[in-house]
Curated annotation (Swiss-Prot):
Protein's name in the database: Inner membrane-spanning protein YciB
Keywords of this entry: Cell inner membrane, Cell membrane, Membrane, Transmembrane, Transmembrane helix
Membrane topology: Multi-pass membrane protein
Classification via Pfam families: IspA
Gene Ontology CC annotation, any one: plasma membrane
Organism per entry: Pseudomonas putida (strain GB-1)
Gene: yciB
Amino acid sequence: MKQFIDFIPLLLFFIVYKLDPRPMEVAGHSFEFGGIYSATAMLIISSLVVYGALFLRQRKLKKGQWLTLIACLVFGGLTLTFHSETFLKWKAPVVNWLFALGFAGSHFIGDRVLIKRIMGHALTLPDAIWSRLNLAWIAFFLFCGAANLFVAFTFQDFWVDFKVFGSLGMTVIFLVAQGVYLSRHLHDDPSTSKPKD
């Protein structure tokens, strides 16, 4: 359910983007609704509403949610200010690479890698497995960032579809692969440091 809530702004962005632009008037102001700029405005507004509601309910947001919200406001704001979708195309790569940087930094900062801090309360695994899993997440975020960047600037008519459904598909595939990998190690002795091949 929480993952679906995070997906709402992106889904609304996609729906508005796919609409044929049509003139509208609100409070005496006329504008065109539909297309990339209306979709960007919808992304910003819906992100503020969704994460604002989550913050009021939980009194906090996860660091990843803060990063996503700030990136949406910055890159979405630049897109609308300069009327250039180039800024928005950089949002997904930058966010993914910042996530990769955060996961990588946890190998050197603190006593636990980031994936263990996130999932350690639910799973008991040897540290070597946690380390390998953390490296897999780093590789995943680096790949997603590169894939988003490549599609955004190579396939102009397809990048929004990929941003929504391609990224979602890659995440699902990665999570399934992670589940299969973890199933092999759930009964490992946490005191051991040598992972299975």
